[in-house]
Amino acid sequence: MTNNLSGYRNKIVRVKTSKKRPISSSNWLRRQLNDPYVAKARLEGFRSRAAYKLLEIHYKFRLFTPNMKIVDLGAAPGGWSQVASKLIKASDNNLNNKIISIDLLEIEPIVGVEFLQKDFFEKDTEELIIHNLEGKADIVMSDMASNTIGHKATDHMRTLLLCEQAFEFALKVLKPSCHFIAKIFRGGAETALLNKVKREFRTVKHFKPVSSRSESTEIYLVALNKK
């Protein structure tokens, strides 16, 4: 599991624009076909290129160790849960290693991962996660993002709201000295949230993985050592 992209950048795939296909769809398809991380994910068995973002976060901050309990919010299609499963050496028989993953969309089974197909915002979802976790969590991670509409300010605020909800949940379930990871889009309104996070965690960092597309405003909030 490395970020060596040798051999993934050599071939450019061109996409003809169909009369029936919107230009935006053609651009998305072209970007996917020519993205070295998409190709690398297919070859290495990861379900999405997002897997490499979490790997980079781990290699930078060394968050994951065996015998952890983890909550993955917005898990589909499962790339982050796959990475976490490998890093904590999860198995279906080891109750000390546990990953609870949640999303509205279904994901295929992953070793050591218990998946809940639920809306995180439903009233009973938090209680269900806490019940299934059987104790406090070591890491809460959220790659949740709202469906983008191309309006940066709106996309920023919608994803920031998801991050705030994930943060409030993390405060309830994390053990002391444990960690929270979440995606945000830069846009200026995140300062108030960052101040809240800094009051609850000893170290708070911004991190943009190399595997995050350069044109994207996404960054990751890495909050270490809950007080």
UniProtKB/Swiss-Prot annotation:
A Gene Ontology term for the protein's cellular component: cytoplasm
Catalysed reactions, as listed in the record: uridine(2552) in 23S rRNA + S-adenosyl-L-methionine = 2'-O-methyluridine(2552) in 23S rRNA + S-adenosyl-L-homocysteine + H(+)
Class in the EC hierarchy, top level: transferase
Record Gene3D superfamilies: Vaccinia Virus protein VP39
UniProt binding sites for S-adenosyl-L-methionine: 78, 80, 103, 119, 143
Location of the active site: 183
Domain of life, source organism: Bacteria
Subcellular location(s) of the protein: Cytoplasm
Bilayer-crossing regions: none
Keywords: Cytoplasm, Methyltransferase, rRNA processing, S-adenosyl-L-methionine, Transferase
Entry EC no(s): 2.1.1.166
Gene Ontology MF annotations: rRNA (uridine-2'-O-)-methyltransferase activity
Pfam family, one: FtsJ
Protein role: Specifically methylates the uridine in position 2552 of 23S rRNA at the 2'-O position of the ribose in the fully assembled 50S ribosomal subunit.
Family: Belongs to the class I-like SAM-binding methyltransferase superfamily. RNA methyltransferase RlmE family.
Entries under PANTHER family matching the protein: RIBOSOMAL RNA METHYLTRANSFERASE (PTHR10920), RRNA METHYLTRANSFERASE 2, MITOCHONDRIAL (PTHR10920:SF18)
Protein name as it appears in the record: Ribosomal RNA large subunit methyltransferase E
